[in-house]
């Protein structure tokens, strides 16, 4: 059994798209990032990689490489899954905490969990998804923290 932890954050700016858990969320603000800025998938990618000491998303997909400009974060997550599965691992569970002040994510919970279940190839009851606000401390950013449990 192995546990991995990952974390990611992005500044939010008016007029940019907001991707979370592989979905485009209706929002007046979105992540400033080299890729699509999906903090949830970036945190999950790092969590998977950390469980096997494989570095992090910046090592595998550096923001200095123009190939990754605007890339969907699903690409990064799929590669991290491939790398851990190549070591005989099987993802058992994933838990995420998303922190942002706006937009409110509650109305999108089912769609976000559905997307994670599809991307991670897990049943929905093996995905924890928690929403928090910064209580006004950091209203112009999104942060994601992820923990994964793997067998193998």
Curated annotation (Swiss-Prot):
Which reactions fall under this protein's catalytic activity?
4-CDP-2-C-methyl-D-erythritol 2-phosphate = 2-C-methyl-D-erythritol 2,4-cyclic diphosphate + CMP
Q: Which UniProt keywords apply?
A: Isoprene biosynthesis, Lyase, Metal-binding
Please state the Enzyme Commission number of this protein: 4.6.1.12
The signal peptide here is: none
Q: How is the cofactor bound?
A: Binds 1 divalent metal cation per subunit.
Q: Name one GO biological process term.
A: terpenoid biosynthetic process
The molecule here is called 2-C-methyl-D-erythritol 2,4-cyclodiphosphate synthase
Q: One GO MF term, please? A: metal ion binding
Traced from the root, the source organism's taxonomic lineage reads: Bacteria, Thermotogati, Deinococcota, Deinococci, Thermales
Name any cofactors this protein relies on: a divalent metal cation
Subunit structure, as described in the record:
Homotrimer.
Organism of origin is: Thermus thermophilus (strain ATCC BAA-163 / DSM 7039 / HB27)
Q: What does this protein do?
A: Involved in the biosynthesis of isopentenyl diphosphate (IPP) and dimethylallyl diphosphate (DMAPP), two major building blocks of isoprenoid compounds. Catalyzes the conversion of 4-diphosphocytidyl-2-C-methyl-D-erythritol 2-phosphate (CDP-ME2P) to 2-C-methyl-D-erythritol 2,4-cyclodiphosphate (ME-CPP) with a corresponding release of cytidine 5-monophosphate (CMP).
Pathway given for this chain reads: Isoprenoid biosynthesis; isopentenyl diphosphate biosynthesis via DXP pathway; isopentenyl diphosphate from 1-deoxy-D-xylulose 5-phosphate: step 4/6
Sites where the protein binds a divalent metal cation: 8, 10, 42
Where 4-CDP-2-C-methyl-D-erythritol 2-phosphate binds, per the record, is at: 8-10, 34-35, 56-58, 61-65
Site, Transition state stabilizer: residue positions: 34, 133
User: Can you tell me which family this protein belongs to?
Assistant: Belongs to the IspF family.
